[in-house]
From Swiss-Prot:
The keyword Cell inner membrane does not apply. The keyword NADP applies. GO terms for biological process: L-arabinose catabolic process. NADH-dependent L-xylulose reductase; part of the yeast pathway for L-arabinose catabolism. Reversibly converts L-xylulose to xylitol and D-ribulose to D-arabinitol. It has a much lower activity with D-xylulose. This is NADH-dependent L-xylulose reductase. Keywords: NADP, Oxidoreductase. Induction: Strongly expressed during growth on L-arabinose. Belongs to the short-chain dehydrogenases/reductases (SDR) family. It is an enzyme of class 1 (oxidoreductase). PROSITE patterns: ADH_SHORT.
Amino acid sequence: MTDYIPTFRFDGHLTIVTGACGGLAEALIKGLLAYGSDIALLDIDQEKTAAKQAEYHKYATEELKLKEVPKMGSYACDISDSDTVHKVFAQVAKDFGKLPLHLVNTAGYCENFPCEDYPAKNAEKMVKVNLLGSLYVSQAFAKPLIKEGIKGASVVLIGSMSGAIVNDPQNQVVYNMSKAGVIHLAKTLACEWAKYNIRVNSLNPGYIYGPLTKNVINGNEELYNRWISGIPQQRMSEPKEYIGAVLYLLSESAASYTTGASLLVDGGFTSW
């Protein structure tokens, strides 16, 4: 039975994390560093991504007190551009001298308009980033692994509880449909790539009390109370509360039979 005791160590593994400057990504990257993974940090702004890499290195040495910090690299990448994505992923493999075994796609965004007034350009951009971007990074990740016959890889696509339900009071039709697409994309890829032993799952957060949410609330206590009134735990989540779920989904020893899953981590919001 000892060979079935799961481990969350990722020593020697390479993980690509998109949206690496975001609040959720920051928590997940810190978790991956703590468990030994090398990390390629991808975001749309090279300068900001390089600055975040320096912050993560400082965290690893001063907070985690690691004597040997996992290797990191920062890359500018617009995930809505397929050609760019494939070029950046190829460069990552060249720089690290190995193919990534794990992909965490956190890149994406949200904006709200009433459905009848939703600008077409805004809608198209969000679908390209949130949904097609998830497809493009998954393709660029899996294709060389399939070609080389490397097994045991894993993908976590960040969806949202808004891909499973329509949460009041936001007018976010395109965000909702893009995240619903991400959930079904993960299921479809899981089925297509099971024969290559590449697992694909979606993690679907509830409300996260981070910079973006704070900006939306902007001191509006009524809006805040309205949001948490639908959460059985009566609070929003913190980014760090998603680390364990993502490490589980990435771990081949812990989650070898978990693929195509849509994991809701929402404080019970969708249970009511």
